[in-house]
Amino acid sequence: METTGKRVLLVEDDRFLRRACEASLRQRGLAVTTAADGEEGLRLARSERPDLILLDMLMPKLSGLEVLRALRGDEATRAVKVLILSNSSREQDIAEVSNLGISGYFVKSNLSLQELCDRVSQLLRAET
């Protein structure tokens, strides 16, 4: 399945990383909406209905964990694919979000934009 035109919501408070990810995703033909905090991200997830969400864990207003719990508790957003971007590589942090049904977990210090974009494309192509 083609990924061009698929909608990705990028929720990340680090402006540099947000812009770098956005540019890389747009180069692959994806429609990218961005949010700089968890509250805005949750609002956009509900109104824009993205095909996939890239979600930072530590953000102002609402944490990524709070956003993820709200997404999974809402019938309209329950099934959306979510990839986590986090500074934490602690197993308990990974397990906590994994139990909420994520499609992947990336540690920012090891982040490769190529690898991230490849994973996003893979997940979006897998949609039926």
Q: Where do the PLM segments sit?
A:
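Conserved acidic carboxylate
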Residues: 12
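Charged docking surfaces used in two-component/phosphorelay signaling
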Residues: 19-23, 27
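Active-site beta3 strand of CheY-like receiver
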Residues: 48-54
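Acidic catalytic/metal-coordinating carboxylates
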Residues: 37-40, 63-69
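Non-catalytic signal-transmission and effector/linker regions of two-component phosphorelay proteins
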Residues: 1-7, 114-128
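Active-site residues of response regulator receiver
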Residues: 56, 86
